[in-house]
């Protein structure tokens, strides 16, 4: 449900959203950003990552594909799943992908490519653009577990990102919202001369949608 005639400041929008939730479970809070670049079918898909300073409100599970000292670093950093060629074989055979992110060292990517068709459609393929192909394993595990989220504009030119849940305070949701807005704004194509954001909305899983302004 959306009243298109009412536009709120980000703080007001969050307040309205938190007041309107009625579900008996902890609803997610999401931001939807309509971009001025058009739909993804025109080749203007926007994709990237944002680090949420207040996290996601849940455990983020991380898998690391590496060997030797890098595998040890991954375990020490708290990675949930760590393996090398054996793990790749398990994934080929249908191992449950019980993780949110997959990180790999650059020297291991030639082997990881063997499961690209499995990881790719689920958004789990290690990607240098997301920082998930790296030798700095410990640092990346920490970043991802702290609340890194990936985003990509859909076929309608809209970016959808979870910024927390209704158990978060207004201040924490604002911090996460600013982080997402900054990350998306940073990907504005040089060909876009005017405003990059056409409209921004906040909504919860089962609640209303609130249009906000003053972010981009």
UniProtKB/Swiss-Prot annotation:
Family of this protein: Belongs to the universal ribosomal protein uL1 family.
CC per GO annotation: large ribosomal subunit
Biological processes annotated in GO: regulation of translation; translation
PROSITE patterns per record: RIBOSOMAL_L1 (PS01199)
GO molecular-function terms, A-Z: rRNA binding; structural constituent of ribosome; tRNA binding
Lineage top rank: taxon: Bacteria
Organism: Anaplasma phagocytophilum (strain HZ)
Short name of one Pfam family: Ribosomal_L1
Described purpose of this protein according to its UniProt entry: Binds directly to 23S rRNA. The L1 stalk is quite mobile in the ribosome, and is involved in E site tRNA release. Protein L1 is also a translational repressor protein, it controls the translation of the L11 operon by binding to its mRNA.
Annotated keywords: Repressor, Ribonucleoprotein, Ribosomal protein, RNA-binding, rRNA-binding, Translation regulation, tRNA-binding
Quaternary structure (record): Part of the 50S ribosomal subunit.
Protein name: Large ribosomal subunit protein uL1
Listed InterPro entries: Ribosom_uL1_bac-type, Ribosomal_uL1, Ribosomal_uL1-like, Ribosomal_uL1/biogenesis, Ribosomal_uL1_3-a/b-sand, Ribosomal_uL1_CS
PANTHER family xrefs: 54S RIBOSOMAL PROTEIN L1, MITOCHONDRIAL, LARGE RIBOSOMAL SUBUNIT PROTEIN UL1M
């Amino acid at each position: 449900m959306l009243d298109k005639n009412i536009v709120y400041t980000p703080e007001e929008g969050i307040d309205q959203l938190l007041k309107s939730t009625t579900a008996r479970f902890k609803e997610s809070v999401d931001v939807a950003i309509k971009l001025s670049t058009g739909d993804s079918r025109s080749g203007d898909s926007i994709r990237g990552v944002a680090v949420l300073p207040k996290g996601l409100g849940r455990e983020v599970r991380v898998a690391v594909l590496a060997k030797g000292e890098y595998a040890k670093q991954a375990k020490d950093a708290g990675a949930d799943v760590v393996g090398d060629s054996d793990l790749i074989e398990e994934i080929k055979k249908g191992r449950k992908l019980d993780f949110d992110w997959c990180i790999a060292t650059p020297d291991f990517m030639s082997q990881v490519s063997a499961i690209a068709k499995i990881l790719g459609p689920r958004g789990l393929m290690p990607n240098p653009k997301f920082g998930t192909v790296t030798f700095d394993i410990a640092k990346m595990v920490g970043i991802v577990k702290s609340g890194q989220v990936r985003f990509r504009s859909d076929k309608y030119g809209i970016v959808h990102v979870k910024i927390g849940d209704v158990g978060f305070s207004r201040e924490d949701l604002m911090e996460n919202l600013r982080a997402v807005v900054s990350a998306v704004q940073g990907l504005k194509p040089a060909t876009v001369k005017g405003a990059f954001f056409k409209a921004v909305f906040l909504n919860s899983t089962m609640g209303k949608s609130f249009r906000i302004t003053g972010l981009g």
